[in-house]
Design a protein with these regions (language model features):
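Acidic/histidine-rich, surface-exposed loop or edge segments in extracytoplasmic proteins
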Residues: 21-35, 345-349, 353-374, 427, ...
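Feature captures C-terminal
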Residues: 13-18, 28-34, 42, 121-130, ...
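Hydrophobic alpha-helical scaffolding
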Residues: 37-40, 101, 182-190, 260-261, ...
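A short C-terminal boundary segment appended to hydrolase-like catalytic domains
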Residues: 154-162, 274-416, 564-588
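C-terminal low-complexity, Ser/Thr- and acidic/Pro-rich disordered "stalk" regions positioned immediately N-terminal
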Residues: 582-620
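Sec-dependent signal peptide cleavage junction
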Residues: 2-13, 612-623, 642-644
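Acidic, metal/ion-coordinating pockets
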Residues: 5-302, 378, 383-386, 551-555
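C-terminal membrane-anchoring or membrane-association module
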Residues: 628-646
Length: 646
């Protein structure tokens, strides 16, 4: 009840529950902005600016998963760096998150206890209502009581009341089934919608919650929302989209569904309106709350909004403070870890003209598959072979692919550091295994070779233009790359012979598996290891649409680290990845025959048989001469016999 109120109390008080939210940040963590493009990353320092700029501090700061895994900054500390920032970056930090499918990459126990990396007394909660683990309990929800005050502007009297809000989290059970078995050993997933509905009911009936918000990492947010009962809003992750729609839930009531892109490019602010019915009295015992989720308001903020706010010196000060006191110390730790020596390389693995990457972007699409000397295969997709070899070693798959756009560096002979590996694979992409037929795989490789062939023609024209005195940029502007040039595939698990004189669909002369030496069978189904990006590119590679996802693994960078850390990794990689050679797709005509030996001068030899034998060589003259000689010998022998008989 209120003890400070005097004056005219309204029958209904309008208010909002505000939730600032993120999803799928994938280890992105600090602010950046490109004014020319109008794009950038909000980061935790930019988030602090957005948070502080609100007229009233948001009631909740929530995240919908795929948070602790992706960028090397996150993976090298197994998510601890991100967990620390979530907890301490500004104010009280995040209230809660829910696991995304990639967050399990460090194992279920490490994920469940991720909040243990907190340096505060009130860490964020890790919510997964539908997960059950043998080694510990997953939290299903959190509850927060919001103290509200209504003020009478005329009398300056106030009326105090409370709104109870529950937050429940879960991950789509179908995502759990795609995870590596060893990472989720002892953990099972029940129906996410069922678990959320049960917890929402408990929160309302047992805890007296007026508002229930769900955070969930789910395959399809709108389909998922339609299954929810007793939930006012769904803050979703996984689809990497900007979403703001009403969906009718299983209880017939609107569920506001929101999602804020990915990679910290966006931050959402959801306002859920309610009406607090005072019943016209100062007592609160019989007061009721009505929530109008369908009338919710969603605002989406980007790095540009942060940039605009930085015109205020106070906001710039907040950004600088978070960066210097929270982010920089972790950056320093990351830099030190990047200098760790993982192993040593006896050879250069070229990314372009050299291991350093001179013309790497150009060469990995072109002459890596078309050396100037057809007999020189020393540069043929060497860094691509290392990458594919690491995928094969990690997963045990039959085949592997990596697109040119995903490769950003090579390996020079000598010590290989963690930083070198990050430079090769900087995007935080993950390794996945899929199943597809040999025919679909070969079709994709053939189209990749066509893209490479077209890129090679562009590159030759560009180089000629540069030789004529123009800049490389002018050359690329005049002789442009194909838009899909980054889709050229490096591949592993097969020994391949390519005939560049043939057209698309006919260039692969032979392909044998490194596993067992058998020919790649178009009718057989194989397991293919790939990064999670290129396998979804069904525009350039339509046959990928026929593939079936099998298992998710760790980051591409982690696969490289694991391979290079092994003794004798280069020979292992070579045996797994296979070779590329160049030959002819045409079969030579029947070779010229070896001349037949002279027939024996045996009385049992017949002219008919000898003539046929010689004629088969194609030398009719020789056959005729042979027949005459043998005929003459027969005549002489008969003459001798006749004389003796005489």
């Amino acid at each position: 009840p209120s003890f400070a109120f005097a004056g005219s109390l309204p029958g209904v008080i309008n208010g909002d529950v505000t939730v600032m939210h993120t999803n799928d940040i994938h280890g992105s963590y600090k602010y950046s902005y490109n004014a020319g493009k109008g794009t950038g990353t909000v980061g935790f320092d930019g988030l602090a600016v957005l948070y502080s700029a609100q007229s009233n501090a948001p009631d909740f700061l929530l995240d919908a998963g795929d948070t602790f895994h992706g960028q090397s900054f996150a993976t090298m500390s197994e998510g601890k760096s991100i967990a620390e920032l979530m907890d301490t970056f500004y104010a009280d930090g995040y209230d809660a998150t829910t696991p995304g499918n990639h967050d399990w990459s460090y194992g279920a126990d490490k994920l469940r206890t991720m909040t243990g990396n907190s340096t505060t007394s009130s860490p964020f909660a890790m919510l997964c209502a539908n997960a059950t683990s043998a080694n510990g309990t997953w939290s299903a929800s959190i509850l927060k009581t919001l103290n509200r005050t209504w003020k009478d502007n005329e009398s300056a009297s106030t009326f105090n009341y409370q709104i109870k809000v529950g937050v429940v989290g879960a991950m789509d059970e179908s995502l759990g089934s795609s995870l590596r078995a060893d990472l989720v050993a002892g953990t099972s997933f029940s129906s996410a919608a069922g678990a959320i509905n049960a917890e929402a009911k408990r929160l309302r009936e047992d805890e007296g919650c007026n508002v229930v918000v769900c955070i969930a990492h789910t395959l399809n947010a709108k389909t998922f929302a339609a299954q929810l009962d007793g939930v006012d809003a769904l803050i979703a992750g996984h689809e990497h989209v900007n979403l703001d729609e009403n969906v009718t839930g299983a209880d017939g009531k609107p569920v506001r569904v929101v999602e804020a892109g990915s990679a910290f490019a966006e931050v959402g602010l959801l306002s859920i309106p309610y009406e607090y019915d005072t019943k016209g009295t100062e007592t609160t015992d019989d007061d009721t709350v009505s929530v109008y989720a369908g009338d919710s308001d969603e605002k989406l903020y980007t790095a540009k909004d942060v940039n605009d706010l930085l015109a205020d010196p106070n906001n710039q000060s907040i950004l600088n403070d978070v960066h210097s006191t929270k982010i920089k110390p972790l950056d320093d730790d990351f830099e030190a870890a990047s200098n760790e020596v993982l192993g040593a390389s006896a050879a250069d693995y070229f990314y372009g003209e050299d291991a350093a990457g001179t013309h790497g972007w150009e060469m990995v699409r072109t002459t890596d598959f078309r050396p100037n000397n057809p007999d020189d295969t020393t540069k043929a997709q060497t860094i691509g072979h290392v990458i594919c070899g690491s995928y094969l070693d990690l997963t045990g798959a039959d085949l592997a692919i990596e697109n040119a756009g995903g490769i950003r560096g090579g390996i020079a002979a000598g010590n290989v550091t963690a930083g070198n590996v990050i430079a090769i694979s900087p995007y935080g992409n993950t390794v996945e295994t899929w199943t597809m037929t040999g025919a679909d795989f070969l079709t994709a490789l053939e189209h990749s070779l066509q893209i490479s062939d077209d890129c090679n023609k562009s590159y030759e024209l560009q180089q000629a233009y540069v030789a004529a005195g123009h800049t490389e940029q002018e050359a690329q502007d005049k002789y442009k790359w194909r838009d899909d040039s980054g889709s050229v595939l490096s591949f592993g698990g097969i020994n391949v012979t390519i005939d560049w004189t043939q057209s698309e669909g006919k260039r692969i002369v032979s392909a044998t598996l490194t596993k067992d030496g058998t020919a790649l069978d178009p009718a057989k189904t194989y397991t293919v290891a790939t990064n999670n990006y290129i396998i979804t590119n069904t525009t350039d590679f339509p046959t990928f649409a026929n593939a079936t996802k099998y298992t998710e693994w760790g980051t591409c960078e982690a696969a490289l680290r694991a391979l290079i850390g092994q003794s004798g990794w280069e020979s292992k990689m070579a045996s797994l990845a296979g070779t590329v050679s160049f030959g002819s797709a045409t079969v030579d005509p029947t070779p010229a025959p070896t001349p037949a030996p002279s027939p024996k001068t045996d009385t049992k030899v017949t002219t008919k048989k000898t003539t046929v034998k010689l004629a088969a060589t194609g030398d009719r003259t020789l056959a005729a001469v042979g027949a005459c000689l043998i005929g003459g010998i027969v005549v002489i022998i008969l003459g001798i016999i006749w004389k003796r008989r005489r």
